[in-house]
Amino acid sequence: MKKVIMLLLIFALFAYALSASDPNKCLKKGSKCVSVGKPCCKPATCNIYANRCIGW
């Protein structure tokens, strides 16, 4: 039973790592962001006037 739980935990962590590293999930700092349909990667935010992801 412990082995099954451990395998499920490892599978869940692996799936989370793959989903977190998806390059199409968010826009990098400096990317055009208005009317793209994707959010800027944290901690950047979309500046509507500059049409760019800006931030720290």
UniProtKB/Swiss-Prot annotation:
The keyword Disulfide bond applies. Pfam families: Toxin_30. It comes from the Eukaryota. Coiled coil: none annotated. The keyword Cell division does not apply. Keywords: Disulfide bond, Knottin, Secreted, Signal, Toxin. Residues 1-19 form the signal peptide. Expressed by the venom secretory cell of the spine. The spine is a cuticular structure containing a single large nucleated venom-secreting cell at its base. It is an independent unit capable of producing, storing and injecting venom. On the back of D.vulnerans caterpillars, spines are grouped together by 50 to 100 to form scoli, of which there are eight in D.vulnerans. GO terms for cellular component: extracellular region. One of its GO terms (molecular function) is calcium channel inhibitor activity. It is found in: Secreted. Belongs to the limacoditoxin-22 family. The presence of a 'disulfide through disulfide knot' structurally defines this protein as a knottin. This is U-limacoditoxin(3)-Dv21. It comes from Doratifera vulnerans.
